[in-house]
Amino acid sequence: MRSLSPRSVLPGLAVLLVLGAGAAAHANKPVPFGDRVDEPGVADASPVSAQSLATGNLELRVGPGLEAYDQATGEHLWSYRREGATALHLAMAGESAVVVWDDGMITSVRPSDHAVRWHRAVPGLADWLRADGEPGADTRTDTERRDTELERAAAALQPVTEPEPWVAVVTPALTMAFRDRDGDLRFNARPLADCSYDPLRTVHSDNAVLVPRSCTGGNSAGRPLPGLITGFRLDAPNWLLNAGPNVLLHRLDGHRAAVDDGPVIGTRTFDTVQGALEPVCGSPAVPFEAVKPEGTCSKP
């Protein structure tokens, strides 16, 4: 049997040292984004808001992380937390629970095994949630600040199910869309200069997100820029709809939204599959329209 010389032993030792160092580094690697899953009773699970969602045999609640309870017994099963961050709002995107955190992070969690699927940071989201520097911010109570955060978090996160689950995250300066199955950024959009998106007036259908904008500037002729609604979709070009600066949107069903543009123009119905307004019932244009009126509607 050939004996090993000191020189021949060195490469093997080097490999072992490298593997050992790698294992030690992996063992001491910080948990990404402060993630941790706690068993019942490990940490306080007092709710941040009254929001709850049911999925499978679980009831999911917000605060201070994503809290899971047994629907039948009410037993607290697990908590998903992030160090230094508080969960504000959750929505289901397919089988995933998508959470908005107060530090501007968006997280997708699979409730069935509390696996964290992806994290995405949205620029400017945390600042908008806090409303720092806005009129009246210095005089708000802690309760008012938290209520503002909760309202804005709910408006920012817009879940969509078609053609596959995805979410849009809307802030005044930016709209981003993430595909849920892998967290892939599908698009991002910014409004024109001197304009801003309005998350609080934004609505979603099953296949699109409708985002109004408002503008403070004017065009080259000095006239104020009009309001506008942008329709964002995952699998098709976006569309634009002219509207007044104070237009209000209301979801009617999975593929239609009401566009309330004030007493002069009135309320119209928008089809988010066709990307077009439904014609008014009784209008001469009805036979030639691609989008037909659905149900009953008022005569012109």
Predicted feature locations:
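Secretory-pathway ectodomains
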Residues: 1-300
